[in-house]
């Protein structure tokens, strides 16, 4: 592959909530927040054929296969699927209000979603952005080659080489080939939540975080897009103030968000259906195999049988870095248990996360996901 083709495949990339009485709602989720966009795109593609090309034009695609070539793990055709889902934290353009522009985008949220054979169960493995890893060599946007290196923060992979480098880094870490890539943008996420009419969250304690602009009392709230973004970005209001507490907040919010999509009554208003489809497809970047409405429809349709009780969400096993308490290190043996299980299409064993600094349940004392 030429430097030019490599470069073409790489992209750089508060207020209080209103109180509501808790509602008794049966929980059913598809899998992760990016799949919300895919689910709405399904409806948009089938019910609004007249705007099919408009929605297609919204979706941004990147050719991961062309960028990475053959330097990838073996494709195991056992009926399962693995998807890398990223939330981009670019502070440029419309996203500038959410923090200082540091010159390039980084992956603020990273999840490996494993859908088991039969598409009735799934596991989600969150990767802390502050994890120090061995980052592989990657092509950059301007055609150069970044050599990678040891003790690199995980989220710098996206900064250096966009989606292709993020996928390559995850594949080198896990030994698992990613079947798909989905990226969700800050501004698009916020707009989608507003179009949905907000998402219900119950906080058991007050959350105050000036950095994410989140200010919530204990109780049940309907979060608008701004507040929802604050919730998934907050770290100082939960647990020890690290990225680990934020990950658990994100996992709890995903369940509430997807439940809201299920119950929102999409067919009650064609205008709302179109707006949701338009917002959802505008908010995401996918691999080239998913960057049209028809492909998203097929993809999301295969996930609709997965319910809340069929999904396991964990954080990649890690430990605090003795040299820097603001960073974490992979627990290599425990991580290997996770990757081996997913590669074999098996459940993640409890022993893999028992000794991890993550998954301690701190968020359960703050936000209810029931």
Can you annotate each of these PLM segments?
Residues 2-370:
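Non-catalytic, solvent-exposed segments at the cell envelope interface
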């Amino acid at each position: 592959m030429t430097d030019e083709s490599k470069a073409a495949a790489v992209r750089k990339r508060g207020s209080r909530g209103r109180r509501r009485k808790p509602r008794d709602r049966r929980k059913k989720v598809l899998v992760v927040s990016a799949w919300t966009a895919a689910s709405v795109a399904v409806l948009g593609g089938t019910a609004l054929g007249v705007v099919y090309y408009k929605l297609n034009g919204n979706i941004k695609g990147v050719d991961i296969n062309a960028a990475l070539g053959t330097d990838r793990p073996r494709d195991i055709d056992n009926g399962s699927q693995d998807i890398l889902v990223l939330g981009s934290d670019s502070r440029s353009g419309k996203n500038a209000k959410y923090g200082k522009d540091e010159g390039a985008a980084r992956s603020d949220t990273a999840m490996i979603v494993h859908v088991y054979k039969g598409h009735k169960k799934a596991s989600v493995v969150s990767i802390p952005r502050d994890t120090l890893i061995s980052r592989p060599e990657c092509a950059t946007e301007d055609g150069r080659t970044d050599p990678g290196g040891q003790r690199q923060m995980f989220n710098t992979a996206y900064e250096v080489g966009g989606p292709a480098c993020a996928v390559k880094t995850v594949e080198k870490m896990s030994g698992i080939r990613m079947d798909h890539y989905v990226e969700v943008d800050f501004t698009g996420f916020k707009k989608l939540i507003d179009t949905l009419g907000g998402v219900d969250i119950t906080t058991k304690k007050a959350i105050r975080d000036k950095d994410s602009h989140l200010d919530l009392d204990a109780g049940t709230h309907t979060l608008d897009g701004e507040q929802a973004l604050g919730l998934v970005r907050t770290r100082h209001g939960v647990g020890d103030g690290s990225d680990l507490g934020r990950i658990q907040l994100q996992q709890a919010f995903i369940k509430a968000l997807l439940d809201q999509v299920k119950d929102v009554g999409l067919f009650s208003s064609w205008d709302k259906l179109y707006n949701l489809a338009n917002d959802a497809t505008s908010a995401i970047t996918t691999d080239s195999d998913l960057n049209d409405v028809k492909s998203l429809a097929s993809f999301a349709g295969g996930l609709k049988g997965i319910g809340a009780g069929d999904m396991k969400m964990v954080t990649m096993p890690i430990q605090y870095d003795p040299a820097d308490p603001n960073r974490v290190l992979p627990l290599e043996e425990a991580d290997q248990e996770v990757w081996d299980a997913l590669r074999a299409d098996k459940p993640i064993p409890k022993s893999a996360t028992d000794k991890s600094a993550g998954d301690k349940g701190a968020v359960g004392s703050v936000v209810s996901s029931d």
